[in-house]
Amino acid sequence: MARGPKKHLKRLAAPSHWMLDKLSGTYAPRPSAGPHKLRESLPLVVFLRNRLKYALNGREVKAIMMQQHVQVDGKVRTDTTYPAGFMDVITLEATNEHFRLVYDVKGKFAVHRISAEEAAYKLGKVKKVQLGKKGVPYVVTHDGRTIRYPDPLIRANDTVKIDLATGKIDDFIKFDTGRLVMVTGGRNLGRVGVIVHREKHEGGFDLVHIKDALENTFVTRLSNVFVIGTEAGKPWVSLPKGKGIKLSISEERDRRRAQQGL
């Protein structure tokens, strides 16, 4: 009989996008409870040890974090299994480096370095808009933030630009055709394109038709779409290598051969 939350995570059951090898142990770091879901997050220990190679093991990661060198969205974090997720800004003060967690077209979190100016803000997808106690309006974003007194024009599925120093909304983008979006779930995870058409299905899932920079069109659920810019070629955040354009296997092969001069 289960009593309370699980405290362990087997390595084979861990999300594949963490890219942990099977033979390095039985267990994987289980993310703490936090702003992102377990399968949509990346524990800081995996980011520092496996991706950046700044530590050899978990003990070294703990030593780095207990010296308050690591910040997520402008706040010092000392929990090695803190779940960082999509659009989070990770700052390493000792090396003066800033990273934003965004997906590449392979569906994995890219190690994407950003400037100090870009690290001052993040984008958040509005999940719901409601009235609280005493009629105070508020919005809830994809990373669990509750922001009171938003602009009355903001609706669900819009994207807000959040100042990390104050936690307030600086600007927002309406969800509409012609907007630049990134896909955050499903088989098209990490692809970037422009909204062409929205299909409404009563009692089902709304679908969004998206066209990428190579004029390829694909369809995904509305819940997987995250607006990142007002129009094509003008994202509000910098994109990782590949710019969210997914190539076929043959196209990848041809590009690789061209780089090798074959």
Swiss-Prot record:
Q: Where in the cell is it found?
A: Cytoplasm
Q: S4 RNA-binding domain: which residues? A: 42-105
A GO molecular-function descriptor: RNA binding
| Keywords from the named record | Cytoplasm, Ribonucleoprotein, Ribosomal protein, RNA-binding, rRNA-binding
The record's annotation in Pfam families points to: 40S_S4_C, KOW, Ribosomal_S4e, RS4NT, S4
Start and end residues of each KOW domain: 178-211
Q: Which InterPro entries match?
A: KOW, Rib_uL2_dom2, Ribosomal_eS4, Ribosomal_eS4_C, Ribosomal_eS4_central_region, Ribosomal_eS4_central_sf, Ribosomal_eS4_KOW, Ribosomal_eS4_N
**Would the keyword Phosphoprotein be found if you checked this record's keyword annotation?**
no
Q: Which GO terms describe its biological process?
A: translation
- Show the GO cellular component annotation of the record: cytosolic small ribosomal subunit
What Gene3D superfamilies is this protein classified in?
Answer: 2.30.30.30, 2.40.50.740, RNA-binding S4 domain
Physiological role: Component of the ribosome, a large ribonucleoprotein complex responsible for the synthesis of proteins in the cell. The small ribosomal subunit (SSU) binds messenger RNAs (mRNAs) and translates the encoded message by selecting cognate aminoacyl-transfer RNA (tRNA) molecules. The large subunit (LSU) contains the ribosomal catalytic site termed the peptidyl transferase center (PTC), which catalyzes the formation of peptide bonds, thereby polymerizing the amino acids delivered by tRNAs into a polypeptide chain.
State the family named in the UniProt similarity comment for this chain: Belongs to the eukaryotic ribosomal protein eS4 family.
The record's subunit annotation is: Component of the small ribosomal subunit. Mature ribosomes consist of a small (40S) and a large (60S) subunit. The 40S subunit contains about 32 different proteins and 1 molecule of RNA (18S). The 60S subunit contains 45 different proteins and 3 molecules of RNA (25S, 5.8S and 5S).
| Protein name as catalogued | Small ribosomal subunit protein eS4
**Which species does the entry assign this protein to?**
Candida albicans (strain SC5314 / ATCC MYA-2876)
